[in-house]
Amino acid sequence: VTASPTILIADPDEETRLALAEAVARLDPGARIVEAADGGALNRALAGSRIDVLFIDVLLPQTNGADIRRWRETGNPRGLVVLVTDMLAPRWPATARRVGAYDVILKPLGDLHIGRLLAANQVLSRSLDCLVVDPGQATRTLVRKLLGQSHFAFRIREAAGGRDAVRLAEAGPVDLAIIELSLPDYPALEVACRINDRHPAARILMTGPRIEEGVQRQLATFGASGFLPKPFQFFDIDKAVHESFGLWHPYLINALRRESLLDAGPTVGQVV
C-alpha cells in the first residue's frame, strides 16, 4: 500500500491555499499538507520536508525557477511539480519544461484535476520494472531513450526474443512489458499470457504495425492493456504508458507535442 503523500501548496492567496488543502484532504485524508505564501517559505519547506507533490503558483513572489528545478533533480527526483496559473502565457509549455514540471493546470482547481495528480503520484513515485521485448536492437535502444524522457522511473531489462522474455519474467518482477507482435522464436501473445499469469498486475503493451481496432480489442484476451502502433515518438509511448496505468495524460505533454510537431524526433519504424 502506497503511503499518503506530503503536499506542498505554494500560493500567495490564502483562499486558494485553503481550497486546495481542503480538496486534497477530501481525496486523501492521510495526506500531510504544507503551505507557503512566498519563495522564502517555499525554499524552507522544500529543505525541511520530503515533498511528494508541489503545487506552485507561477507568480509566487520571490521564487526562482532554478531553485525548483534543483529540488526536482536533487531533493526528491520522484517529486511532482504542478504549476498553477490563472491564465496561460505564451510559450508556457517551454517554461514548465525548464522547471521540470509534470503539468500545468488552470485555477480554480477542481477535485477531478487534483485527484488525477494524486493518482499519478502514486505510480510515478515508485521505481517500476519494465521489460522491453523486440528483435531490433535499435528499437530497444530507442524505447529505452524515450522512456528515460518521461516522469516515470523505470528499471529496464531487454529481450530480443520471446524465450528470453519469458525467462526474464520468471526471474524477476514486471510492472510494464512492451512486446513486439512479431517475434522470431516464440508467439508474442503467448509471451504476454505467460507474463500475465506470472505477474497479474503487470501492464502489457503490444507494439507493431497498425492493426484494426477489433484486433486491438482482442489483445486484451491475452492480458494486453493496450496497443502502441509503430512508428511512435515520445508523445505516443508516454500516452500509452499513462493509459496502461489508468492515469490521465498531462496537458503539458500534449502542448509540448503541438509545439514540437515541426521538429519531430526519430521514430520507431524509420531506419535508425
Language model features: what each stretch is:
Residues 66-78, 118-120, 167, 189-201:
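Short amphipathic alpha-helix used as the core "switch/output" element in two-component signaling
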Residues 14-34, 137-157:
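Two-component/phosphorelay signaling modules centered on CheY-like receiver
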Residues 84-85, 207:
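Hydrophobic/aromatic residues positioned on beta-strands within the core alpha/beta folds
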Residues 66-67, 87-103, 190, 210-226:
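Alpha4 helix (beta4-alpha4-beta5 surface) of REC/receiver domains from two-component response regulators
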Residues 116, 124-148, 157, 248-272:
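CheY-like receiver
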Residues 91, 109-117, 214, 232-242:
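C-terminal output helix
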Residues 103, 114-124, 237-250:
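Receiver (REC) domain switch/output surface
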Residues 21, 35-53, 61, 158-176, ...:
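Acidic, metal-coordinating helix/loop segments flanking the phosphotransfer/catalytic sites
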